[in-house]
Every structure is written in C-alpha cells, then in structure tokens.
Amino acid sequence: CDVFGYPYDSTLEKISKRTSEVTVATKVTKEQLNRIYESGLKGIYYSEDNYRYYPYGDFMTQVLGFCSSDGFGQTGLEAYYDKYLTGVNGKILTETDLVGRSLDKESGYYLPAVAGLDVKTTLDAGIQSIVEGAVRNAVAKFNPKGVACIVMDYSNGGIAALCEYPSFDLNNVPRDDLTLLFESSKSRIISTVYEPGSTFKILTSAAALDSGKVRTSDRFYCAGSKVVDGKKIRCWKAKGHGSIDFGQGVEGSCNCVFMECALRMGTNSFYDYLSAFGLTRKTGVDMTGETSGIFIDRNLVKNVDLARIGFGQAVAVTPIGLLASTSSVINGGIKVTPHVMSEVKSNSQTIASYSLSGGDRVISESTSNTMRELLQRVVTTGSGKGAYVAGYKILGKTGTAQKYENGQIARGKYISSFLGFSVSEGANYGVLFIVDEPQGYMYYGSLV
C-alpha cells in the first residue's frame, strides 16, 4: 500500500478474494517494482505490457483523446482512428492437453505482432503551444467557467491547433470520476452549441450582399431599437447609431442593420444560405462527438425570429461549425471541411490521405473580397480594434452573447468571443477564441 499509495482496507479486501490471481496495480515503475521485491513478499509477480504514454502530458488533450485501460481509443483522434492506430497482437499456437498444458513446445507456431499505422496530422506544435499559453492567460485573467480556442487553415480546413479548459494530463486520466472525465475530455468546440452573438453577423453580411438584397452603399437608420411583429428589439448601442451606410453598420456591429438585412432576404433565402454554409448539419470533422447547430424550423420562423437570427440570437451553433462556415466567406467563397488527419502511413506507403479537392461554392468571389475589406475595417477602426497588430492584415468580428438557463436569460452570464482571420502568404489561419462566463466587468467580446 505504501509503494502504490493505495488505501490499506480496500487493498486487503481485493487480495483476500478466493481467486487464482488479482491485479493490484498497473503501469508500475521500475522503482516501485524494486521496492516490492526488496520487501521479500511471496506470491507476487509482474507481467510486461504496452500502453500509451504521452510525453507532453496535457498537451492537445481534447484533440488527441484518451484510451481505455486496455488500449482502445475512447475520444478524439484515438477513437476516430483507432482502427488504424491499433495493431494486431502476436500469438503462439501450440497443441495442448485437456488442462491447457503444451504437449510439444517444439511444434509451436509463432504469429508475429503487427504494428499499428502512423497517422500524420495537420496540427502544428508551435501554434498549439501559443494557443495553450493564451488559454492559460485567459483562465488566469478572467476566472471563467471555460475557455476554448481553435486555429484552422481557412483555405483547406486543416486544423492547426485546438485547446480547451478545463483539461487533464493524458497520462493521468480521471477514470474514477466519470462526471469529471466526461466534462474535461469532451471537445466543446466539436460537441457543444452556443448562441454566437455578433460573430454570426459575418454570415448575415455575406448572405445579404451575395443575394443582392443589400449593397455596400445602402444607408440604414438606427434609433437604438427596431419594432418587429410588435416587439421592440434593441441595438447594443442604446442611443442608436443614427444614419449609417452598410460598411459602418458592419464596423460598428449595429444590430438594427443586421435585422434589416435578414428581413430583406426573407426566411427561405436566408436559410438557403445558412444551409449552403453548412451550419444546419455536422461539418464532418474527423473527431468523435460532433453535433450540429440548432435552428428554428423555417416553416415556423416569424419575422421577429428572423430579425434576431440576423444578429446572432435565436440560433445555436458549434464553434467548429461557425469557423468552418465563416471560412467560406474569407477564402473566396468555397466551402471547406475541417479535418485533422493529413495521411495514414505504413512505413513509406500511404494507406489513406485527406483529399483537398475543391468544395462547393457558397458565395461569389466578389462578395468574399468585399467581406474581407469590411472585416479588416472592424479590426482597424471598429469594434475589434483590440486585435489590431501593426504590420499584419487581420480581419475579424467580436461577439458577446447572453447565456440561457432553463429557457430563461441567465443574468450576468455571458459567452465572449473573437473570430479572426490572418491574411498573409502561407499563413491563412482562422481563429475562434471563446471565454465562457468571464468574471468581472470585462465580459464584452471586444475586451476579452
């Protein structure tokens, strides 16, 4: 008990059972094994086995996933590519008597073990290190319920980094606490939906422009609220933005502008675009546990619902779904599929690889170019200027959304986020950073 740190009573109960053998401990170190033998205890032996060891501990926990105690993948890449990663055990075939004793050891036949295959990923350890540092800083600064960040190449969907808090060391999986294990091992980026708030306005803008229902020269008037179906819906700026053009509406994130955009398109046209962006179904990312966004049935949508959807309310999306769909807005209008696997190899032979063939066109290249210009203004002089870095071309949109509990708005609880894109030679990355329930007064996405 002293060697392994186990409770005396439960260990005594385990070894007192009437059975031929009992496993007392697994993954025993050489130091622990030496202490056992030095104690002179009789009837104790060990067997060697192979198991997963993660040299970087809690690095990439959610995306890598973990294995069961017998080596089978349970979550993340470990589960999704288990059929490739798991090898075949070796065997010795011999003739035995009725009680299982070998009759002729010389006539045994050995079947050698077959090693598992190698899965090459799109993950970048350098970018992952930066992201994990940023997540730790956000945890220390905002004391939130959770933090998540994903970085993806918006030109082809290759995921470069994914990090979430809370997390755990993959070498010390909390198997004894199933609630903790479930909450800390699942990827919220893949499996959890949330109300995106103003980051959703990227899609509304692109759809409105591409449909021809809105032009960049159109002017709008924001009085601080808009009445739809007899209900007053407020802009975040209580005094209103006044008379502004479309570009100023995007730059200042005016809710009234995006309500009008959605209403001009109408439910069917707007929903057709959202479907084309891929938001109404799973992205197809090669990780376990993915879910799809939640939308009101288009046949049940009222104008007041449509207006709210326009600025990111009355809708729920997954982070991976939002990043994938907005990537189409930035990359020239082509739909991408998020993925982590680059290729599967056996020695030098490629068994499987991810096809980078072009996806469906969602919006025109002209609309995409216009959106890039507008979103650069958001970062340069608008609501996202906190993300501005001199010498770099950065596009983006902030988001602050209220949370709901039991169907009601949870007062004082917010999800703050920033959705940004870098535009440079060889580094076309989209980044979605989410802070769940930041504490204190700094809860707006523009501050977080």
Language-model region placement:
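Beta-lactam-recognizing serine transpeptidase/beta-lactamase-like catalytic domain environment
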Residues: 97-108, 149, 153-198, 203-437
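Short, basic and Ser/Thr-rich N-terminal targeting/leader segments
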Residues: 57-59, 143-145, 388
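Short N-terminal helix-loop-first-beta-strand/juxtamembrane motif that initiates sensory/input modules
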Residues: 42-44, 140-154
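Conserved, well-ordered alpha-helix/loop/beta-strand core segments that scaffold catalytic motifs
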Residues: 21, 103-147
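Extracytoplasmic/secreted cell-surface and envelope-processing proteins
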Residues: 20, 32, 171, 258-260, ...
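Amphipathic, well-packed alpha-helical segments that form the structural scaffold of globular domains
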Residues: 82, 86-89, 108, 120, ...
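Small/polar-residue-rich segments within soluble enzyme cores
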Residues: 1-116, 433
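A short acidic/glycine-rich loop-to-helix N-cap element
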Residues: 435-448
